[in-house]
Swiss-Prot record:
GO terms for cellular component: cytoplasm. Part of the AaxABC system, catalyzes the decarboxylation of L-arginine. The arginine uptake by the bacterium in the macrophage may be a virulence factor against the host innate immune response. InterPro entries: Pyr-dep_his/arg-deCO2ase (IPR016104), Pyr-dep_his/arg-deCO2ase_sand (IPR016105), Pyruvoyl-dep_arg_deCO2ase (IPR002724). The record marks 52-53 as: Cleavage (non-hydrolytic). The modification Pyruvic acid (Ser) is found at residue 53. This is Pyruvoyl-dependent arginine decarboxylase AaxB. It comes from the Bacteria. It comes from Chlamydia abortus (strain DSM 27085 / S26/3) (Chlamydophila abortus). It holds the Pfam family PvlArgDC. Trimer of an alpha-beta dimer. GO terms for biological process: arginine catabolic process.
Length: 195
């Protein structure tokens, strides 16, 4: 029996940061710092697969904090994510990293929800920052990107944009910040039949 394309129906938002004085080339911040950020985000025991940024309407109202679903996580499972994540080195002049994910929902001409889109944001800073700076920068750039997603498709905004962000002031040699949406439950669209 054929199955149609798969789409998520439950998601969670999460984030984490990590830092280390140790690392392996060619991207030393990917090794220890990334693992620490995954641990803080509570997704360290998944096999992470990145998505692009289109959200089915079934996710509207079904995006929860990671703490609501962590007890259901399966060690070694595949986790499909939309993730903003980057590392940096203080040796190269970066002393803070901010990451964020934003979500917009669109409606058709009758006001019916058609689905959504996500945008990812990463910014490096030459000095330490605080949460107010991290949040304001994330919202500013994500708002611009989300509005572009709607304008590109000539779609009207259905509801308020949603924003999630994280940041790190790097105190060691390397640092990493990530913000992510993870997808847990799925359904299948009707299979396609070509006649």
């Amino acid at each position: 029996m054929p199955y149609g394309t798969r789409y998520p129906t439950l998601a969670f938002h999460t984030g984490g940061v990590g830092e280390s004085d140790d690392g392996m080339p060619p991207q030393p911040f990917e090794t220890f710092c990334y693992d620490s950020a995954l641990l803080q985000a509570k997704i360290e025991n998944f096999n992470i697969v990145p998505y692009t940024s289109v959200l089915p309407k079934e996710l509207f109202g079904n995006i929860v904090p990671v703490d609501q679903c962590v007890k259901f996580f399966k060690h070694g499972a595949v986790l499909e994510v939309i993730m903003a994540g980057r590392g940096a080195s203080t040796v190269e002049g970066t002393h803070a990293i901010t990451t964020g994910v934003g979500i917009c929902w669109g409606q058709d001409k009758n006001g019916e929800l058609i689905g959504g889109w996500a945008a990812e944001y990463v910014e490096f800073f030459p000095t330490w920052i605080n949460d107010e700076i991290a949040e304001s920068h994330a919202k500013m750039w994500l708002k611009k990107s989300l509005q572009h997603e709607l304008d590109l498709r000539s779609v009207v905004k259905h509801s308020e944009f949603q924003y999630f962000h994280n940041y790190i002031n790097i105190k060691q040699k390397y640092g990493f910040s990530l913000t992510a949406l993870g997808f847990l439950n799925f359904e299948n669209a009707d299979p396609v039949t070509i006649k």
